[in-house]
UniProtKB/Swiss-Prot annotation:
NCBIfam families: dnlj, PRK07956.1. This is DNA ligase. The active site is at 115 (n6-amp-lysine intermediate). It catalyses: NAD(+) + (deoxyribonucleotide)n-3'-hydroxyl + 5'-phospho-(deoxyribonucleotide)m = (deoxyribonucleotide)n+m + AMP + beta-nicotinamide D-nucleotide. Disulfide bonds: none annotated. InterPro entries: BRCT_dom, BRCT_dom_sf, DisA/LigA_HHH, DNA_ligase, DNA_ligase_AS, DNA_ligase_CS, DNAligase_adenylation, DNAligase_N. GO terms for cellular component: cytosol.
Length: 670
């Protein structure tokens, strides 16, 4: 028989679980925050006095444990495949036709759900207790993030029934919570998150669960992967089971035919603003689980489900000013300064205008009312001017005749749309951007050396170029703002560790125009040291696959410049490794090896050459035409005939978000 204390602890846990469910799942609390806090504090007091009565599923155990060194890998019981994409009504109709053809049946019910813009997670319960939470990873292997999953209040630590079940769902942050989170970060002088999805993904992958607990994460369940109970017959049945077990469940609607599905998808394009969280589309699934088994899956996606992607959201605002930034290669890029406006979950106050030709083509003027849109994490762009709102006060913008950073000459090279500052070695903006590029993740990956520190180092004359970083001492950094001894020590250690980066990363870090990470990797297959590459002739370079005359000329000109040779010599003297290791075993993460990509349409987050470069850097191949041998067709805005060809041949189609997921999965598993 339980003692009085044991019984009180049990009662408290039941009460707390009930009120957590009312508050975090039903959004319908029955008691005040103060009353809830009293219950929690009473339970904490009792468990501290009686530690032998603490159980893993107690509400007090949501946050605990020491920070991890790394996340363990988890192999999923059932692979978590990506969904195919539908971009319009025709794609949805074709999806339904394929299913009817494969099943040869009269009636099929579909279920339509919100596609929440967050991070997928897989939760495993045994006997009703949460034993593991994992990320999707690459779909086959994810990461064990149980300690962080437990901190999410809407994740039940104990289900309402003692069942064995594996659940899939989405970790996300509500719009209001995201705004408050960014306000707190700004007050602390921290960089705000770009959007709720980034914030959720970054939070769930914190090695210290206390940091995850401080973020306002939520969880919605949307599927049952495995269930050791009475057989489920339908997806709707699975969702209702999840609701009965205590989960917050995704909104859904059962539809009798694809016409109803299409209408619901169209309705939510506008209605999504009403939701408290971000969605970037709808998911359509066959309802009957038996039919799903018959349909099966390809190697990449299930045949019984598809994601309908919303078009990029557009909002109206005003151009307050047009400013010019100077990049590391001297390009002068115009940016519109906007009246702040909410677009796709984040406040937009700037938008790229790309170049002078784009400004002229769209006739963008200071004072104009414009439509802006953003997709993913990239800087938004001005789509078009609303000329009907002009009142005559708008000002025509003219590109500067000299560099705004150094006053140097600017030129527009033949065949290019951008103006460039030709003061390569003397322009402070190019110097700063070059150093930022050098320390970036894909280059030398020097953690803790970011824009704020680099600005101080330049301002105080402690560095003039990226090679000078290797001559810094801890004593140089300690007096700087927001540093201190620990931060200074960490920065110096990170700089020292970067001396042994693979040669292809060093070549990329140098900032040679037109030489991305993929081209850098290709170069190291032929040239085993930087000195070998510096001696290469133009004829040798153009003979290499992926290297054309433009890239070859850029490489030759870079190494001809005395200043660049001087900086490289400083790198060598500082002990930076400028050759491949003798055993030839360099850092390799060729996760796209053997995969062929084709691109069509305009991408928002990459130029075509940047996207191509990322594929090549990961061992993949990019071709210009679609065939049965093509693995992926990446589709941007206004795709051409390649998109139709891919659909005809059944080639996997990736929108830009899915393409980013492919790249990110490779990064996470490299």
């Amino acid at each position: 028989m339980a003692s009085k204390v044991e019984q009180e602890i049990r009662d408290l846990r039941e009460k707390i679980r009930y009120h957590e469910y009312r508050y975090y799942v039903l959004d319908d609390p029955e008691i005040s925050d103060a009353e809830f806090d009293e219950l929690i504090q009473r339970l904490i007091d009792l468990e501290e006095k009686h530690p032998g009565l603490v159980t893993p599923d107690s509400p007090t155990q949501r946050v605990g444990g020491e920070p991890l060194d790394k996340f363990d890998k988890v192999e999923h019981r059932v692979p978590m495949l990506s969904l195919g994409n539908a971009f319009n009504e025709g794609d949805l109709t074709n999806f339904a036709r394929r299913i009817y053809r494969l099943l040869d049946t009269g009636k099929i019910d579909f279920v339509v759900e919100h596609k929440i813009d967050g991070l997928s997670a897989i939760l495993t319960y045994q006997g009703g207790r949460l034993i593991r939470g994992a990320t999707r990873g690459n779909g086959v292997v994810g990461e064990d993030v149980t300690a962080n999953i437990k901190t999410i209040p809407s994740v039940p630590l104990r289900l309402k029934k003692d069942v064995d079940i594996e659940v899939r769902g989405e970790v996300y942050i509500k719009k209001d919570d995201f705004s408050k989170l960014n306000e707190r970060r700004l007050k602390k002088g921290e960089e705000p998150f770009a959007n709720p999805r980034n914030a959720a993904a970054g939070s769930i992958r914190q090695l210290d669960p206390r940091l995850a607990a401080a973020r306002p994460l939520s969880f919605i369940a949307y599927d049952v992967v495995a269930y050791e109970g009475e057989g489920l017959q339908t997806h709707v049945g699975a969702l209702e089971l999840l609701r009965e077990l205590g989960f917050k469940v995704n909104w859904y609607r059962k539809c009798d035919d694809i016409t109803e599905v299409v209408n619901i998808c169209k309705d939510w394009v506008d209605k999504r603003e009403e939701l408290p969280f971000e969605i970037d589309g709808m998911v359509i699934k066959v309802n009957e689980l038996g039919l799903r088994e018959q349909l099966g899956a390809t190697a990449k996606s299930p045949r019984w489900a598809i994601a309908y992607k919303f078009p990029a959201q557009q909002k109206t605002t005003v151009v307050k000013d047009i400013i010019i930034s100077v990049g590391r290669t001297g390009a002068l890029t115009p940016t519109a300064v906007l009246e702040p406006v909410e677009v796709d979950g984040s406040t937009v106050s700037r938008a790229t205008l790309h170049n002078e030709d784009e400004i002229r083509r769209k006739d963008v003027r200071i004072g104009d009312h414009v439509l802006v849109q953003k997709a993913g994490d990239v800087i938004p762009e001005v789509v078009k001017v609303i000329k009907s709102k002009r009142d005559g006060s708008e000002q025509i913008f003219h590109m500067p005749e000299t560099c705004p950073a150094c006053g140097g000459e600017v030129v527009r090279e033949e065949g290019e749309a951008v103006l460039r500052c030709v003061n390569v070695t003397g322009c402070p903006a190019q110097r700063r951007e070059g150093i930022l590029h050098f320390v970036s993740r894909n280059a030398m990956n020097i953690d803790g050396v970011g824009p704020a520190l680099i600005d101080q180092l330049l301002e105080k004359g402690l560095i003039e170029d990226y090679a000078d970083l290797y001559y810094l001492k801890k004593e140089d950094l300690i007096p700087l703002e927001r540093m201190g001894e620990k931060s200074a020590t960490n920065a110096i250690e990170a700089i020292r560790a970067s001396k042994d980066r693979p040669l292809f990363r060093v070549i990329f870090a140098l900032g040679i125009r037109h030489v991305g990470l993929g081209v850098a990797r290709v170069l190291t297959e032929k040239y085993r040291s930087l000195s070998d590459l510096m001696r290469a002739s133009g004829e040798e370079l153009v003979a290499i696959d992926e290297i054309g005359p433009t890239i070859a000329r850029s490489i030759i000109e870079f190494f001809k410049e005395p200043h660049n040779r001087e900086v490289i010599n400083k790198l060598k003297e500082a002990g930076v490794r400028l050759e491949e290791k003798e055993n030839g075993k360099e850092e390799q993460n060729l996760y796209l090896s053997g995969k062929t990509f084709v691109f069509t349409g305009k991408l928002d987050g990459f130029t075509r050459s940047e996207a191509r470069d990322k594929v090549i850097a990961a061992g993949g191949k990019v071709t210009s035409s679609v065939s049965r041998k093509t693995d992926y067709v990446v589709v941007g805005d206004s795709p051409g005939s390649k998109y139709d060809k891919a659909r005809e041949l059944g080639v996997t189609i990736l929108d830009e978000d899915k393409f980013k997921e492919v790249l990110k999965a490779g990064d996470n598993n490299g």
